[in-house]
């Protein structure tokens, strides 16, 4: 009986970890983590937005993202980019990311990957209102 209860208790914790990791908030990724996510064989759908610390529009956009996060069936990730980045590994990862997303012209930029693929109509640049994000 003790073994059964112990197994049930362990299963409960295991299954609890199967839900969204960060309920109600986007998950920050490094450029390298974004590349890993893009190469994920599961081909999950997710949204990625790119932002910066010194960007008023980005700060306001994060509030909009937090409003819609609970209403989305997919994970939302974000990448904070420093335009003056000097780390060569990060620069290389950002360049590789831009092969998939295209050149990032302005911040914030939003990309919706449907089953691992990015369609041109799923790339948006600049601040978006809540209604535009949920289309």
Language-model features and meaning:
Residues 1-4:
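Positively charged n-region of N-terminal signal peptides that target proteins for export
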Residues 74-93:
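Thiol-based oxidoreductase modules, predominantly thioredoxin-like and allied folds used
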Residues 53-56, 82-86, 117-119:
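Solvent-exposed loop/turn segments at secondary-structure junctions
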Residues 36-74:
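Local sequence-structure signature of Cys/Sec-based thiol-disulfide redox active-site neighborhoods
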Residues 47-49, 76-80, 109-112:
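Structural recognition of the beta-strand scaffold that forms the well-ordered cores
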Residues 103-135:
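Non-catalytic, surface beta->alpha helical segment in thiol-disulfide oxidoreductase systems
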């Amino acid at each position: 009986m003790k073994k059964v209860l112990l197994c049930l208790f362990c299963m409960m914790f295991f299954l609890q970890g199967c839900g969204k990791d960060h309920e109600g908030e986007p998950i920050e990724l490094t450029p390298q983590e974004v590349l890993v996510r893009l190469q994920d064989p599961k081909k999950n759908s997710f949204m990625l937005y790119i932002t910066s610390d010194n960007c008023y529009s980005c700060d306001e956009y994060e509030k909009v993202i937090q409003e819609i996060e609970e209403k989305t069936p997919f994970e939302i990730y974000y990448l904070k980019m420093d335009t003056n980045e000097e780390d060569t590994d990060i620069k290389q990862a950002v360049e590789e990311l831009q092969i998939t997303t295209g050149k990032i012209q302005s911040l914030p930029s939003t990309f919706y990957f449907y089953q691992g693929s990015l369609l041109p109509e799923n790339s948006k640049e600049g601040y978006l209102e809540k209604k535009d994000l949920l289309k």
